[in-house]
Amino acid sequence: TKSIAGELPCNEVYIYRNFGSKEALLQAAFNRADIGFVQNVLKHIDVMDEADRPLEERCHALWDPVWTFSVGRPDIIRFYLRYYYSAQYLTSAHELHHRNYQQLQARLSRYFRSPRDSWFLMAHVFETILSFCSHILSGELENTAEVSDEVFQLIFRTLQPYMLT
């Protein structure tokens, strides 16, 4: 909490007063980031219902704003990378994450052969986005249209056998 308070114009005592603990603060921050990501996907998901367009084109039309949203928020991605892969996430926020994604999963499940698959495939997409964003943040990759398309192709080719056309 000292480092958090040091980065913000507030006293450490306010963190405890408002959240009770550092863990509760991190969980609330994770919840906010999670909801923002899900809302962004839901905002653009209607493109998947455009049956007159080929599947890959529809998926790419959904991909572009999701990728732009993700790479445009480096602080959120850094936070996700630190928290999502932590033991605290497993004990404090895993169920919250699943609740946050229920609406998205319900919507996406109609595009997959099995609703069970949609949970695992959503996690795969999310974790792939995090992974490639981390490579961009570290300078290993540049945020270019070519990289975006390569990541899209990797994800799409992985999902394609599980998708309904």
PLM regions: where:
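Histidine kinase transmitter module recognition
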Residues: R17-N18, A51, F69, S114
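Helix-loop "lid/cap" segments that line or gate small-molecule binding pockets
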Residues: D64-V71, F79-S86, I155-T158
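Short, structured helix-loop boundary elements
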Residues: T1, E23, Q27, D52, ...
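Short, basic, alpha-helical segments at the C-terminal edge of helix-turn-helix-like DNA-binding modules
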Residues: N31-V38
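Helix-turn-helix
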Residues: T1-A24, A28
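Amphipathic alpha-helical packing segments from all-alpha helical-bundle domains
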Residues: V38-L42, G72, L81, A87-R113, ...
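Hydrophobic alpha-helical connector segments
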Residues: A28, K43-G72, V125
